[in-house]
């Protein structure tokens, strides 16, 4: 039961952090790519790799930080929505593919680097 509470608290905090980061980047930068989602997913991927690589032995930490906070911070559903919204009558296949590749390949690389630090 404590794990569920830790995931809920961490997830809520991660979602709040994502919302704040998204608001900040949407107001500061204009881009064809959704930069805020890219940033939170890459940072989250790196931190997941780092946390797993460090093998932190605090029993509550993975539930709170990895599953909760980083799960709330990163967002696959927003990525799916953004990719779907790119499929308009003015669909740009290069933008779509570049954004997809940035998210998945660079996300994996960020996780890998975090794991091996």
Curated annotation (Swiss-Prot):
**Record-annotated membrane-spanning stretches:** 1-21, 46-66, 95-115
Q: Provide the alphabetized UniProt keywords.
A: Cell membrane, Ion channel, Ion transport, Membrane, Metal-binding, Sodium, Transmembrane, Transmembrane helix, Transport
The entry marks the following residues as binding Na(+), namely: 71, 74
Indicate the principal place this protein occupies in or around the cell: membrane
Please, one GO biological process term?
Answer: cellular detoxification of fluoride
Describe regulators of its activity: Na(+) is not transported, but it plays an essential structural role and its presence is essential for fluoride channel function.
> Which GO MF terms are attached to this record?
fluoride channel activity; metal ion binding
One Pfam family recorded for the sequence: CRCB
Record-level GO cellular component terms: plasma membrane
Protein family according to the UniProt entry: Belongs to the fluoride channel Fluc/FEX (TC 1.A.43) family.
Give a short account of what the protein does. Answer: Fluoride-specific ion channel. Important for reducing fluoride concentration in the cell, thus reducing its toxicity.
- Name of the protein described by the UniProt record: Fluoride-specific ion channel FluC 2
Q: Name its species.
A: Staphylococcus aureus (strain MRSA252)
């Amino acid at each position: 039961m404590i794990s569920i509470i830790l995931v809920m608290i961490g997830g809520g905090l991660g979602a709040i952090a994502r919302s704040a980061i998204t608001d900040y980047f949407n107001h500061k930068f204009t881009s064809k790519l959704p930069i805020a989602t890219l940033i939170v997913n890459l940072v989250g991927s790196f931190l997941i790799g780092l946390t797993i690589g460090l093998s932190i032995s605090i029993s509550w930490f993975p539930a709170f930080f990895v599953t909760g906070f980083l799960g709330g911070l990163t967002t696959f559903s927003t990525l799916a929505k953004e990719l779907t919204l790119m499929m308009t009558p003015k669909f740009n296949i290069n933008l779509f593919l570049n954004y997809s590749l940035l998210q998945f390949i660079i996300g994996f690389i960020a996780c890998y680097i975090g794991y091996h630090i």
